[in-house]
């Protein structure tokens, strides 16, 4: 699994003019699924999302997490995180999980997240989504389960 985490003042996902996920302060996570991602990966990566200390405390140090502050998490599927652009100018999307596996894994990841944290919203796999966000910082963190564990 690969994640692009962005600290946001607010973020939302709209599909066909309808808002399907929305948070105020928190983390927007663009989520790319890989072959073999399972509950052990979900647990480790979601713990990173909720425990990463990227919010300021009273002394303006990045010392607080989403869970410390009861902020929201917006999970947005994004297979392009696994793009390979090493050859030519057109990225290849052959890396990462195939669509059926990625859909199931993403939906299971969202289910896991919602069971373990009360403020989780999500986009929809393979939908034409419009993602709006206001970066806060900006703070952007890249996480890859193959490199973290």
Predicted regions mapped to residue ranges:
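Compact, glycine-rich, soluble single-domain proteins
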Residues: 19-70, 83-111
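Short beta-strand segments
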Residues: 6, 32, 77, 142
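Short, conserved loop-to-beta-strand elements that form functional interface hotspots
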Residues: 103-132
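Short, low-complexity, polybasic intrinsically disordered segments
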Residues: 93-96, 136-149
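Residue-level signal for inorganic ion chemistry
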Residues: 45, 76, 139
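Glycine/charge-rich, flexible interdomain linkers and switch-proximal surface loops
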Residues: 58-73, 121-133
């Amino acid at each position: 699994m690969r994640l692009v985490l962005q600290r946001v003042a607010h973020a939302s996902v709209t599909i066909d003019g309808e808002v399907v996920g929305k948070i105020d302060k928190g983390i927007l996570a663009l989520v790319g699924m890989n072959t073999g991602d399972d509950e052990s990966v979900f647990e480790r990566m979601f713990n990173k999302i909720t425990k990463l200390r990227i919010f300021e405390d009273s002394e303006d140090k990045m010392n607080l997490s989403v869970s410390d502050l009861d902020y929201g998490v917006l999970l947005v599927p994004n297979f392009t995180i696994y793009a390979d652009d090493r050859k030519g100018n057109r990225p290849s999307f052959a890396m990462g999980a195939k669509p059926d596996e990625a859909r199931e894994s993403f939906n299971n990841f969202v289910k896991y997240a919602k069971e373990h944290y009360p403020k989780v919203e999500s986009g929809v796999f393979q939908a034409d989504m419009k993602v709006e966000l206001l970066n806060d910082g900006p703070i952007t963190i890249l996480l890859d389960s193959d490199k973290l564990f």
